[in-house]
Amino acid sequence: MKNGLTRVFTIFFFLVLSFSLNFAQVEELENSSQDMLIKSEVETAVSMLRAIFVKHEAGEMSLEEAKKLGADLLRELKYGEDGYFWADTEEGVNVVLYGRKDVEGKNRLEAKDEHGTFFIKELLAAGAKDGGGYVEYWFTKKGKSIAEAKRSYVLLFKPFGWVVGTGYYR
């Protein structure tokens, strides 16, 4: 009897362990897929900014006109159900933040998330790296009052001095 119970317990233990590992792998795979999506979306947005900058270089518009056109583009550019973009200058001044025109033009460098992280500083640092980077922080979703865990990808568009990003809530 004792030997049978030991076997049942051992099998049960390994089934639970196997399920837990598989669940973690599925979650990791989902996050990896989301990471690839947001990186691709930011790279696409930056390539659109690059096309605008090329028009500036060709003398078709001033740098200020190109930046305004770029900001207007990012403000309206969406993907999926609720994907949007934002941009901050390398100094932390917000250029575009979806649904938050009240923030545009304001320096967000000292902004902290719910855990005391200077998330704008981290986003700017990650964006300045060659190839951009990912940052995890807490942010309040539009229409909500409680901050949620968020993972973002950011990339510097050097000609405008903007760090462009998007992210997903975990």
Write out the residue ranges for each language-model feature.
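N-terminal membrane-sensor/transducer module of prokaryotic signaling receptors
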Residues: 1-170
